[in-house]
């Protein structure tokens, strides 16, 4: 059983997770997750966010605990560095610059590009090998290497398809979602009020634009993965010392059976009265502070 502490509404509110988009930009499919509107901006129901976040975190935990691989995806500017930082922190994988078509469905081609990147690095790091090239040729090789690194740095040790994908901004990452659905890979995703929650196995209603919110999500995702990694290593009889010191992507080398999809989580309504009161009081306090 996961030891992940439950996410509370107050922390979500402090991170600005409740702010959706302008009401004119909404996706009607997000209606079940919307609490109301203020100043023509939709307010997300953080009671549902908290419940669904806990479900998503457990999915990440269980995946890594069972030696599965998690791929974090967000190529939007404000999330790019954050995604890479936290994926590396928990020894997982990421795409944060540009999703190349076929990254999942045409892995053979992607593997070829990774091999090309590895060879370029080996050549450029070998002074003797570089002697046979002109300065222009070396400059061209460096440019090719840098371009490949932007797209492949976070998946060069992945070797095969991931067992779970975590996405921030489903609109921008629609190609990644399509490929994951095609391969039956479960998806965890933050869904804003302008998002389409269809095909998302573990939806998390929330602001997918604010840096503070994105960092909050990623810290939770990474902590869940680290706990899963710790349990996995303990089960293997390894003394980790401090799990925070591990960032080696080889710690999760095995493929495991994918988690069963749980699309019915989007219909979660079992939220206790305490959470209701907490959310409404927090919004009231926020209004008072604003005034």
From Swiss-Prot:
Q: Mind listing the UniProt keywords for this protein, alphabetically?
A: Ribonucleoprotein, Ribosomal protein
Supply the InterPro entries for this chain: Ribosomal_uS2 (IPR001865), Ribosomal_uS2_bac/mit/plastid (IPR005706), Ribosomal_uS2_CS (IPR018130), Ribosomal_uS2_flav_dom_sf (IPR023591)
PANTHER family in UniProt: 30S RIBOSOMAL PROTEIN S2 PROKARYOTIC AND ORGANELLAR, SMALL RIBOSOMAL SUBUNIT PROTEIN US2M
Q: Which GO terms are recorded in the biological process aspect for this UniProt protein?
A: translation
GO MF assignments: structural constituent of ribosome
Name the CDD domains on file. Answer: RPS2
Give the gene that encodes this protein.
rpsB
Origin superkingdom:
Bacteria
Q: What is this protein called?
A: Small ribosomal subunit protein uS2
- Indicate whether Ribosomal protein appears among the record's keywords: yes
